[in-house]
Amino acid sequence: MHLRHLFSPRLRGSLLLGSLLVASSFSTLAAEDMLRKAVGKGAYEMAWSQQENALWLATSQSRKLDKGGVVYRLDPVTLEITQAIHNDLKPFGATINAATQTLWFGNTINSAVTAIDAKTGDVKGRLVLDARKRTEEVRPLQPRELVADAATNTIYISGVGKESAIWVVDGETIKLKTTIENTGKMSTGLALDS
């Protein structure tokens, strides 16, 4: 039996065209069903709390007009704002420790991290991660990505800069446990395999 006709250019072209049409119809349906809603200026990262059935959004607001930022609690189905937590520092990166229901936000501009109780919205504490003063020669590392290890209540925070680092923070005491230095130039990504 010859299968040569199954590999003809005409059949390959038809299969490719058919695949593209099917794929584009799915993406059109997905785009039509996607819920979008304007929430605030400077939306940066989100954290999802299954226990609280909430989506938390870090917004830095306006760079020049607003001194701080706002963390919004959103209904994950409707994207309605159910709570707004005003912060004197601009929040950028976001994560949540599901075990303690503590939200963690990286304050990139201030080289700090803020811990917020997800149930009450109260600030539990703040830690400055790089206290060096910014000058022409010195560029303090900036917190970028945050990952929470719920099993150990440890927060890992990438510090972006010329000589990047990862800060390891005790989630209970909100104190620096250790720093993993020299993780590369401008290293931004962070993942936890526990």
Name each model feature, range by range.
Residues 2-6, 10, 23-194:
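Predominantly soluble domains enriched in secretory-pathway, periplasmic, or organellar proteins
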Residues 9-19:
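Sec-dependent N-terminal signal peptides
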